[in-house]
């Protein structure tokens, strides 16, 4: 009998699903929401190895953990929140946002928590996936420790930042003090008065150090190579801004669009080396460092990279240099020789610590690790990727049928929010999944996998473009690329370009098999669409139109108060300059950078 994919998976069909999604983080939730709102498919399961939704935001609990992208853009386009506490959300607030979204869209009934996928194997005869699942929960394991789940389509939503990377340093297992990885934080440990060694100076380290420095007796940061760092300029969002964002929806739209325009403009800064904007940002980074460390000129050269900005992840922080300026915080750039029983030994020094923090990132280029995946003919994903991970637009893999990835190879960004990429991928994959499910409902079969020659041509084009970007700078080694220099993680262009290229599924790019393949092949292409967030008008038009609407609502609500509003001296496509009287302040002209935030600040000044 034909299968009904509109029914939820219940007790009687616990081991069968039309779709299985691995991971309940940003990607997995987005995929599930698209299935709910873009297809009639309800027979799907989300397997989450943790005990909550949120993915990396549920796992990274370290002090100071926060997003590097503004909240208006680092959130789903279809779930814009008007009451973020600050421009850059912290881990706890973003996790709350994720749980709220999961609750609103009814995702919890589809999620199986504490479920670790060990292996996924394609059955050529049955044309289905067989997924081996192990249960982490002690209570669940009383019923069964593991089981096998069959599905017609498998989606990996495990992302790139899910498996911690532990450094290969001799003696790490000999250390007798407290050892914590930044992605596996232990809040039961008391950090007050402790001597702490922090290995690493990347995105997590610069957020951890300022927090630990508040109570630690001494901190030493072990730096392998310097990073480009810019100020975060984080601002709390006040009640009046919340009011405006809540009751003037076009203002939320304007703010997100302007952030999108600014972030896309950053592509020329962070990805294209040698441009005037890139050199200006490098100069700004050095100016910021020197202004924050005026009494430590001996650190200026040590903290200045010799590679193009953007080659490694650009760091943003308002308080890292302030922490580094403290008398009880040191920077050590000598290579670590080994970890001793009591601390860290370099070539000419040994320091004892109560705690060593491993801020050493993730195994980002080892996609799906440690899950064992076997595609058509039993061919392993490890074998398919022996020359490096590659996937068609980061989503589909040769010889791996009815399989899709979210945030897969070459879809990470150095300049914008990855959620914008994930939403485009989720739309694309939901179209493919719908085709497979429709065939199944008609008691037919449909097997989809990318043509090897299409994938090869695509990958060559991507790598050729990447070779011209800052990511390829030989002077730096980053998690964007393998030890051999192959860039496996990053997309070489803008978000808008990616969205346009995946706005339709071109069926000729795929090998279609099964009794339902002919009907799909006849379609040539299926339009997916995209979220259009690049403004079709100038910043000036956006400013004036939304300001008029916001001003009207705001004035009606607060006209009985006395306000001193600064005079706007200049408004243009390149930014704003404003200031007058007691509340005067002037911003640098920056192309669309914080135009919406600037407007909100004008409208949010306190009473005179």
Curated annotation (Swiss-Prot):
- List all annotated glycosylation positions: 4, 114, 325
Enzyme Commission code(s) on record: 1.14.13.-
Which branch of life, at top level? Eukaryota
Binding-site positions, NADP(+): 66-68, 201-207, 224-225
Q: Does the keyword Electron transport apply?
A: no
> Cofactor stoichiometry and binding?
Binds 1 FAD per subunit.
Query: What protein is this chain from?
Result: FAD-binding monooxygenase ktnD
For this protein's source organism, the top of the classification is: Eukaryota, Fungi, Dikarya, Ascomycota, Pezizomycotina
């Amino acid at each position: 009998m034909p299968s009904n994919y509109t029914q939820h998976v219940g007790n009687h069909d616990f081991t069968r699903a039309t779709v299985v999604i691995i991971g309940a983080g940003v990607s997995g939730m987005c995929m599930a929401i698209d299935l709910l709102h873009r297809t009639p498919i309800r027979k799907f399961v989300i397997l989450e190895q943790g005990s909550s939704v949120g993915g990396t935001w549920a796992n990274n609990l370290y002090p100071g953990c926060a997003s590097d992208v503004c909240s208006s853009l680092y959130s789903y386009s279809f779930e814009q929140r008007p009451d973020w506490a600050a421009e850059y959300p912290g881990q706890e607030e973003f996790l709350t946002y994720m749980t709220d979204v999961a609750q609103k869209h009814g995702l919890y009934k589809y999620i199986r928590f504490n479920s670790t996928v060990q292996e996924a194997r394609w059955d050529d005869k049955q044309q289905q996936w067989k997924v081996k699942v192990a249960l982490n929960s002690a209570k669940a394991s009383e019923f069964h420790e593991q089981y096998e789940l069959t599905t017609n389509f498998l989606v990996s939503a495990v992302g790139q930042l899910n498996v911690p990377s532990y450094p290969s340093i001799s003696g790490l297992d000999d250390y007798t003090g407290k050892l914590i990885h930044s992605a596996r934080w232990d809040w039961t440990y008391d950090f007050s008065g402790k001597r702490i060694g922090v290995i690493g100076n990347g995105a997590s380290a610069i957020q951890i150090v300022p927090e630990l420095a508040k109570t630690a007796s001494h901190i030493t940061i072990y730096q392998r190579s310097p990073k480009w760092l810019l100020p975060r300029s984080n601002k709390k969002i006040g009640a009046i801004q919340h009011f405006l964002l809540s009751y003037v929806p076009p203002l939320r739209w304007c703010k997100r669009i302007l952030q999108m325009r600014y972030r896309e403009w950053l592509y020329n800064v962070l990805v294209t080396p040698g441009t005037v904007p890139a050199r200006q940002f490098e100069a700004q980074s050095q100016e910021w460092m020197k202004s924050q460390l005026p009494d430590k000129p001996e650190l200026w050269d040590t903290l200045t990279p010799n590679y193009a900005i953007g080659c490694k992840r650009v760091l943003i922080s308002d308080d890292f240099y302030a922490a580094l300026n403290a008398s009880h915080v040191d920077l050590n750039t000598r290579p670590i020789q080994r970890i001793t029983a009591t601390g860290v030994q370099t070539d000419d020094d040994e320091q004892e610590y109560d705690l060593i923090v491993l801020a050493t990132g993730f195994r980002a280029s080892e996609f799906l690790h440690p899950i064992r995946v076997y595609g058509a003919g039993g061919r392993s994903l490890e074998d398919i990727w022996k020359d490096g991970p590659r996937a068609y637009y980061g989503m589909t893999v040769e010889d791996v049928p009815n399989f899709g990835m979210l945030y897969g190879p070459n879809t990470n960004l150095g300049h914008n929010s990855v959620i914008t990429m994930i939403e485009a991928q989720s739309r694309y994959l939901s179209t493919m999944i719908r085709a497979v499910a429709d065939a199944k409902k008609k008691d037919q079969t449909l097997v989809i996998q990318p043509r090897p020659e299409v994938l090869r041509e695509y990958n060559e084009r991507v790598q050729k473009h990447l070779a011209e970007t800052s990511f390829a700078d030989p002077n730096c080694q980053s998690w964007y690329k393998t030890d051999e220099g192959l860039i496996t993680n990053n997309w070489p262009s803008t978000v808008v370009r990616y969205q346009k290229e995946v706005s339709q599924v071109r069926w000729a790019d795929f090998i279609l098999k099964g009794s339902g393949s002919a009907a799909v092949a006849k379609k040539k292409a299926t339009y997916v669409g995209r979220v259009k967030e690049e403004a079709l008008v100038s910043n000036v038009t956006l400013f004036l139109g939304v300001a008029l609407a916001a001003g009207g609502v705001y004035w009606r609500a607060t006209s009985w108060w006395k306000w001193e509003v600064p005079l706007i001296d200049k408004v243009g496509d390149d930014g704003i300059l404003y200031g007058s009287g007691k509340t005067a302040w002037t911003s640098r002209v920056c192309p669309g950078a914080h135009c919406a935030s600037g407007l909100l600040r004008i409208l949010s000044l306190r009473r005179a």
